[in-house]
Amino acid sequence: FPDDNFLTPGCPECRLKENLRFSNMGIGRIYQCSGCCYSRAYPTPMRSKKTMLVPKNITSEAKCCVAKTQYRVTVMDNVKIENHTACHCSTCLYHKS
């Protein structure tokens, strides 16, 4: 099974990156998380397979680069965006359900 320190080759590490489009709007610097963590597929363990309604031979697991902390900023009078202040690898939203 993969450990949390596994990085995809050729993909930059999960970190804050300045969003130049929003930073140039005169409200200060805006940062967003970017980069990779990992995505891996492996054979489903037999004990897990026995509990599945529809048994699958392959299990996939993915970690995405997401904001650990952020705050909302209003731009153009009514558009709210999130300014990320810290990033980490966490379960991807589409894998949580």
UniProtKB/Swiss-Prot annotation:
InterPro entries: Cystine-knot_cytokine, Glyco_hormone. Pfam families: Hormone_6 (PF00236). Its main location: secreted. One of its GO terms (cellular component) is extracellular space. One of its GO terms (biological process) is thyroid hormone generation. Disulfide bonds join 11-36, 14-65, 33-87, 37-89, 64-92. Keywords: Disulfide bond, Glycoprotein, Hormone, Secreted. SMART domains: GHA. Glycans are attached at residues 57, 83. It is found in: Secreted. One of its GO terms (molecular function) is follicle-stimulating hormone activity. Belongs to the glycoprotein hormones subunit alpha family. Heterodimer. Glycoprotein hormones are heterodimers composed of a common alpha chain described here and a unique beta chain which confers their biological specificity to the different hormones. Shared alpha chain of heterodimeric glycoprotein hormones. These hormones bind specific receptors on target cells that in turn activate downstream signaling pathways. Involved in gametogenesis and steroidogenesis. This is Glycoprotein hormones alpha chain. The lineage of its organism: Eukaryota, Metazoa, Chordata, Craniata, Vertebrata. The gene is cga.
